[in-house]
């Protein structure tokens, strides 16, 4: 597999690749992941790993400059997978799919997972990056034996735009252990005394809407913005400027392990105010911990939560503010959604089922 940065929690693609690979290895398959070289936000201890739960990890040459890291690592991963002794090459995301022709030319079966229409993302809306990702999408259509999509909306897009049939196989989620607040107390956080956003710090996730809305509501609860900044430091600084003057707002930086478990386990509400999603893994995770979720009305979120969450109008700070205030004032509504969330989402999105569906595509002639 390639397209991920590393087997880490840096983003949704990375989590998906790790969950798929772990289960494929347990089924007796030999799995290799071609990862970017260099350091990442998960910590120094992850940089030297050559194997993870039986998954072979190989680093490929990566030009560590904005706009070039993904292109260079995907090219060399495509090259190594083309010449390697592999039956199937599974590529993740539209940009890396640009190089789907490489393993295909050398007789490999090629599977591409479209994690979202990446050319719609703020940082790829123009210039070389936009053209490269658009061509990656076209190359996936042309060279991939099978294409996996994570939402019905993207499935419709490929059918309407290219008359290409795809396979709808969404992401999955594990049933977690809910834990007590301990380490998060260093930020003044306790059970149900904060609203949580946890995910990448990028404009399309809409954290700026959340901060603007939160600053207008009357509550003693805190707002926690948890997530790492990779190549979006400018946006991260903008969020901190927006939050200035409101000491209820807490920025934790990148979190994982016990800290992540505690944040999900003890939140009053989890909020995902995205303008754009492929399939929001953080939303699945939040619901799996039994959270009441407040999400934008984009199809990728609405399809996931159905009637088991609170929904506001995308990009609408006023509506988000009203929904936040109402939730803070009506704990009974929040509690009712909490008790439904975990069983609902874990039954709907099961990783073992998803891996089995993916393996069936690997075996199709």
Where are the regions that the model predicts?
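Aromatic "clamp/platform" in nucleotide-sugar-dependent glycosyltransferases that forms part
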Residues: 275
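Membrane-proximal helix-turn-helix segments that form the acceptor-binding/catalytic region
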Residues: 79-82, 105, 129-147
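Short alpha-helical donor nucleotide-sugar binding micro-motif in glycosyltransferases
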Residues: 254-255, 262-267
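Conserved acidic donor-binding segment of nucleotide-sugar-dependent glycosyltransferases
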Residues: 310-318, 326-332
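Short hydrophobic beta-strand element within catalytic cores of glycosyltransferases
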Residues: 292-295
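A conserved mid-protein helix/loop that constitutes part of the nucleotide-sugar donor-binding site
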Residues: 15, 193, 197, 202-216
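Nucleotide-activated donor-binding/catalytic signature segment of Leloir-type glycosyltransferases, i.e.
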Residues: 236-258
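Glycosyltransferase donor-sugar binding loop
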Residues: 37-39, 173, 198, 222-237, ...
């Amino acid at each position: 597999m390639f397209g991920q940065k590393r087997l880490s929690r840096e983003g949704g693609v990375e989590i998906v690749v790790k969950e798929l690979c772990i289960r494929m290895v347990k089924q007796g398959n030999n799995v290799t992941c071609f990862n970017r070289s260099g350091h990442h936000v998960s910590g120094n201890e992850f940089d030297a790993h050559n194997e993870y739960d039986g998954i072979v990890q190989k680093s490929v040459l990566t030009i560590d400059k904005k706009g070039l890291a993904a292109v260079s690592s995907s090219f060399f991963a495509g090259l190594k997978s083309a010449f390697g002794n592999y039956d199937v090459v599974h590529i993740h995301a539209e940009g890396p799919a640009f190089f789907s022709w490489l393993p295909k030319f050398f007789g490999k079966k090629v599977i591409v997972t479209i994690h979202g229409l990446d050319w719609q993302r703020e940082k790829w809306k123009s210039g070389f990056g936009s053209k490269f990702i658009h061509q990656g999408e076209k190359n996936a259509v042309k060279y991939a034996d099978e294409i996996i999509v994570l939402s019905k909306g993207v499935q419709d897009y490929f059918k309407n735009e290219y008359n290409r049939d795809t396979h709808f196989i969404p992401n999955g989620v594990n049933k977690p252990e809910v834990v007590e607040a301990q380490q998060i107390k260093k930020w003044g956080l306790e059970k149900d005394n904060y609203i949580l956003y946890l995910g990448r710090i990028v404009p399309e996730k809409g954290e700026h809407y959340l901060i603007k809305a939160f600053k207008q509501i009357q509550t003693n609860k805190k707002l926690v913005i948890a997530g790492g900044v990779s190549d979006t430091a400018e946006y991260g600084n903008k969020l901190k400027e927006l939050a200035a003057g409101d000491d209820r707002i807490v920025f934790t930086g990148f979190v994982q392990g016990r800290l992540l478990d505690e944040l999900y386990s003890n939140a009053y509400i989890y909020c995902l105010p995205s303008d754009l999603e492929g399939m929001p893994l953080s939303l699945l995770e939040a619901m799996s911990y039994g959270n009441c979720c407040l999400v934008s009305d984009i199809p990728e979120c609405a399809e996931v939560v159905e009637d088991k969450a609170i929904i506001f109008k995308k990009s609408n700070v006023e509506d988000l503010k009203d929904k936040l205030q109402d939730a803070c004032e009506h704990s009974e509504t929040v509690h009712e959604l909490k008790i439904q969330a975990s069983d609902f989402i874990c039954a709907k999105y099961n990783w073992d089922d998803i891996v089995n569906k993916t393996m069936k595509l690997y075996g199709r002639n």
